[in-house]
């Protein structure tokens, strides 16, 4: 029991030193971040694995300790990597109109709603978005273990074929610009979904504007 208490205290101390505090986007309340969850789960899994491989009580405790330390390092590593990247993107994109969302422990989503970066019906990238994308590229370049998928979306105005092509072209324009900002082409892909994935009501002007968007998914390599 004393051993497990020390183990848990150690994992919480480790996460307290390393983890970046996150807050819920809706409530503003502090959340347990990915690094903290990863360290704790990794430590417990490592301890359990180590405990069942020892020959006697002392050996099992020793193996459990080593397993906990190794599990904590692995479990917290990826989560911490994304916690830091998320924090940098929030700081970089404040007041830009681009939303930063955490989809899960190891996936981020940047949302450029309301046609940000493009004129109506056009796939030419507007110069007004260059500075924002420069900031995104600068952050991404510091995290080489992630990859990007740029997804283009339209509202329901116009025909399906036109919308599909427009969504693909806009996604490729953002992809091309980021590659021009030193993001390696092997780290980024572009896809278009036309009007197939609305996130707002296409029956209203505001809803259609919301659906005209480009999203950048950030995933582990």
Q: Language-model segments: what does each one mean?
A:
Residues 118-151, 179, 209, 216-221:
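Periplasmic peptidoglycan-binding/anchoring modules of Gram-negative envelope and division proteins
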Residues 83-112:
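Amphipathic, membrane-active segments
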Residues 151-221:
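Periplasmic OmpA-like peptidoglycan-binding domain that tethers envelope proteins to the cell wall
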Residues 21-90:
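Short, low-complexity, glycine-enriched hydrophobic/amphipathic alpha-helices that associate
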Residues 14-16:
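C-terminal motif of bacterial Sec signal peptides marking the signal peptidase cleavage site
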Residues 103-134, 154-161:
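Short, solvent-exposed beta-strand/turn patches at coil↔beta or beta↔helix junctions
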Residues 1-9:
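Sec-dependent signal peptide recognition
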Residues 40, 44-48, 85, 89, ...:
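Stable alpha-helical elements in mature extracytoplasmic
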């Amino acid at each position: 029991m004393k051993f497990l208490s020390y183990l848990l205290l150690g994992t919480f101390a480790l996460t307290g030193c390393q983890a970046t505090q996150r807050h819920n986007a809706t409530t503003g309340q502090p959340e347990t971040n990915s690094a903290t969850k990863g360290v704790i789960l990794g430590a417990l899994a490592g301890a359990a694995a180590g405990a069942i491989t020892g020959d006697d009580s002392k050996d099992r405790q020793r193996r459990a300790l080593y397993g906990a330390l190794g599990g904590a390092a692995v479990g917290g590593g990826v989560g911490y990597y994304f916690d830091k990247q998320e924090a940098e993107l929030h700081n970089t994109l404040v007041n830009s109109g681009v939303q930063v969302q955490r989809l899960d422990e190891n996936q981020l989503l940047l949302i450029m709603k309301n046609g940000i970066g493009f004129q109506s019906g056009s796939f030419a990238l507007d110069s007004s978005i260059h500075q924002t994308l420069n900031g995104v590229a600068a952050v991404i370049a510091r995290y080489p273990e992630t990859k990007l998928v740029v997804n283009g979306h339209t509202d329901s105005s116009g025909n399906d074929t036109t919308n599909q092509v427009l969504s693909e072209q806009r996604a490729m324009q953002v992809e091309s610009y980021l590659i021009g900002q030193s993001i390696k082409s092997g780290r980024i892909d572009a896809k278009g979904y036309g009007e197939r994935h609305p996130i707002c009501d296409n029956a209203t002007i505001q809803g259609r504007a919301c659906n005209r968007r480009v999203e950048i998914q950030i995933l582990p390599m």
